[in-house]
C-alpha cells in the first residue's frame, strides 16, 4: 500500500470511519495528488474565491450601513466552510442543496462523538454499541442520507465523463471530476463502457466525497475560527493584512489566484502561526507496530499492535524550537528582508507537524491552506470584526485528541465600505 494511502487508512480508523467506509480505497489519495499542480490549484482557487463571496453574502445576510450583527463564530464559520467545501467537491455548475448541506454538516459533527462512544467500551462490546447507541445510529442516519443525495449526481457525472472528448487534456474543475479521472486511470471504473460493478464503484466515489467533506471542512474551519479569534484579540494585524492582500490583488489583475496568495507572505505567516499555536490535533503520524520492535536509543521494546504517535503540540510549544512559544506572533514566519513566509505554510518539517511529515504527509495540505487563507482574508476584507464579550475567553479546549475552538466566543461584524 502507498504510504499516503496507509496514512489515510490510519487516520480513518482513528476517526472510526472504517466502520462505514472502504478506507483501503486509494482513489481519493490519487485524486488529490493529481490536483497538486499549478493549473489545477488555480482552477480550484478561483472556484473557492467565487463560492466564498457567495457564501459570505448568504450566511451573514448582509447587515446594512453601519449596523453591527452578532454571530456565533464557531457555528457561522462551520456553516460557511461546509457550503464552500461542497462547491469544491461538486463544481461550479451544481445547484445548492440545503438538505445535502444539513446532513453533511450533521454527519461531520457526529463523527467524533460516535467514535468516542464506541471506543469507550471493551472491544467485545463495540459491535453492539455501533448498532444500538444513539450516537452511532445518528451518524449512520446522516451518512445514508448524504450518500442518497450524492449517488445520482456521481452517476450522472461518470456518464458525462465517459461521453466527453478524451483527446482533450482537461483539468478537473472539481474534486469529483478528479475522483472520476482517478477511478478511470486505476481501473476502478471503465472510461468507455458501463461495467457490472458500476453501481458499487459509484457508491464508493460518493463515500469518498463524504470523506473529503469531513477532511476539508472541519480542520480548515477550525483554523479559520482560530484566525478570527486571534485577529479579534490582536487587532493590530488587521490593517497590514488587508493592505497586503489588496496589493497582492493588484499584482494579479484583481483575480484571486494561487499567485495572489504567494504575494501575501504576512497572511501566510499569520495562518501558519495559528496552525502552530492552535493546532487542532495533539498527535500526528499514527503508526501501528506490525512485528516486535526495540528502540535501542531509549531501551524500549514494543509489541505488535502498539500505536505510535508524534506529539505535535509538544513540539510546537517547545521553547528550544520556538522563542516564547505560548505567545501568538503573527509574523513569526515572515522574513521581512526577503518578503516571504519561511518556511511556507504547507512545508512540513520535524518542527512543524500540523500536516505530519515525510512520506505520510497530508496530500491535501496545499489545497487546505489555500482554503484557510482565502476564506479568512476575504472575510477580513469584506467585514469589520470585533469580539462581543469584553473579557478574553479561552480560544479552545481539548476534547479527546482534538483541540476544539471555544463555542462560546461571539463576534460582531459589519460590512466595510472598501471591502473587496
From Swiss-Prot:
Family note: Belongs to the cytochrome P450 family.
Enzyme class: oxidoreductase
UniProt-listed PANTHER family: CYTOCHROME P450
Organism: Aspergillus niger (strain ATCC MYA-4892 / CBS 513.88 / FGSC A1513)
A Pfam family assignment: p450
Record keywords: Heme, Iron, Metal-binding, Monooxygenase, Oxidoreductase
Function as written in the Swiss-Prot or TrEMBL entry: Non-reducing polyketide synthase; part of the gene cluster that mediates the biosynthesis of the bicoumarin kotanin. The non-reducing polyketide synthase ktnS first catalyzes the formation of the pentaketidic 4,7-dihydroxy-5-methylcoumarin from acetyl coenzyme A and 4 malonyl coenzyme A molecules. Further O-methylation by ktnB leads to the formation of 7-demethylsiderin. Then, an oxidative phenol coupling catalyzed by the cytochrome P450 monooxygenase ktnC forms the 8,8'-dimer P-orlandin via dimerization the monomeric precursor, 7-demethylsiderin.
Residues that, per the record, bind heme: 362
Effect of loss of the gene: Leads to complete loss in kotanin biosynthesis, but accumulates the monomeric intermediate 7-demethylsiderin.
Organism placement in taxonomy: Eukaryota, Fungi, Dikarya, Ascomycota, Pezizomycotina
EC number(s) recorded for this UniProt protein: 1.14.-.-
GO MF, one example: iron ion binding
InterPro entries in the record: Cyt_P450, Cyt_P450_E_grp-IV, Cyt_P450_sf
Keyword match Metal-binding: yes
The protein's name: Bicoumarin synthase ktnC
Cofactor(s) required for function per UniProt: heme
Pathway(s) served: Secondary metabolite biosynthesis
Protein's GO biological process: (+)-kotanin biosynthetic process
Catalytic activity: 2 7-demethylsiderin + NADPH + O2 = orlandin + NADP(+) + 2 H2O
Amino acid at each position: 500500500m502507498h504510504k499516503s494511502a496507509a496514512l489515510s487508512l490510519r487516520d480513518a480508523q482513528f476517526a472510526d470511519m472504517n466502520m462505514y467506509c472502504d478506507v483501503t480505497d486509494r482513489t481519493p489519495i490519487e485524486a488529490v495528488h493529481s490536483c497538486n499542480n499549478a493549473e489545477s490549484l488555480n482552477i480550484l482557487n478561483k472556484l473557492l474565491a467565487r463560492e466564498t463571496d457567495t457564501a459570505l453574502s448568504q450566511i451573514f445576510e448582509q447587515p446594512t450601513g453601519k449596523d453591527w450583527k452578532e454571530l456565533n463564530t464557531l457555528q457561522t464559520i462551520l456553516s460557511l466552510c461546509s457550503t464552500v467545501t461542497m462547491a469544491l467537491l461538486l463544481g461550479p455548475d451544481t445547484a445548492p442543496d440545503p438538505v445535502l448541506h444539513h446532513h453533511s454538516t450533521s454527519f461531520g459533527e457526529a463523527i467524533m462523538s460516535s467514535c468516542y462512544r464506541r471506543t469507550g467500551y471493551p472491544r467485545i462490546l463495540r459491535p453492539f454499541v455501533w448498532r444500538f447507541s444513539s450516537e452511532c445510529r445518528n451518524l449512520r442516519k446522516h451518512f445514508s442520507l448524504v450518500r442518497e443525495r450524492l449517488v445520482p449526481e456521481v452517476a450522472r457525472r461518470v456518464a458525462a465523463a465517459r461521453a466527453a472528448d478524451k483527446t482533450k487534456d482537461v483539468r478537473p474543475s472539481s474534486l469529483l471530476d478528479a475522483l472520476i479521472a482517478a477511478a478511470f486511470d486505476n481501473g476502478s471504473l471503465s472510461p468507455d463502457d458501463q461495467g457490472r460493478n458500476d453501481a458499487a464503484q459509484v457508491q464508493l466515489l460518493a463515500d469518498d466525497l463524504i470523506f473529503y467533506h469531513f477532511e476539508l471542512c472541519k480542520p480548515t474551519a477550525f483554523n479559520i475560527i482560530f484566525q478570527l479569534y486571534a485577529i479579534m484579540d490582536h487587532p493590530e494585524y488587521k490593517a497590514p493584512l488587508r493592505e497586503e492582500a489588496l496589493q497582492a490583488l493588484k499584482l494579479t489583475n484583481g483575480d484571486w489566484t494561487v499567485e495572489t496568495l504567494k504575494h501575501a507572505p504576512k497572511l501566510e505567516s499569520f495562518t501558519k502561526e495559528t496552525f502552530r499555536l492552535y493546532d487542532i490535533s495533539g498527535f500526528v503520524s499514527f503508526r501501528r507496530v506490525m512485528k516486535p520492535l526495540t528502540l535501542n536509543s531509549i531501551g524500549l521494546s514494543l509489541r505488535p499492535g502498539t500505536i505510535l504517535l508524534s506529539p505535535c503540540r509538544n513540539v510546537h510549544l517547545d521553547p528550544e524550537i520556538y522563542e516564547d512559544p505560548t505567545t501568538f506572533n503573527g509574523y513569526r514566519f515572515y522574513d521581512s528582508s526577503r518578503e516571504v513566509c519561511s518556511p511556507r505554510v504547507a512545508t512540513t518539517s520535524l518542527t512543524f507537524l500540523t500536516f505530519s511529515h515525510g512520506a505520510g504527509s497530508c496530500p491535501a495540505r496545499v489545497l487546505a491552506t489555500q482554503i484557510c487563507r482565502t476564506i479568512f482574508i476575504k472575510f477580513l476584507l469584506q467585514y469589520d470584526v470585533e469580539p462581543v464579550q469584553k473579557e478574553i475567553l479561552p480560544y479552545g479546549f481539548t476534547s479527546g485528541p482534538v483541540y476544539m475552538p471555544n463555542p462560546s466566543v461571539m463576534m460582531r461584524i459589519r460590512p466595510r465600505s472598501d471591502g473587496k
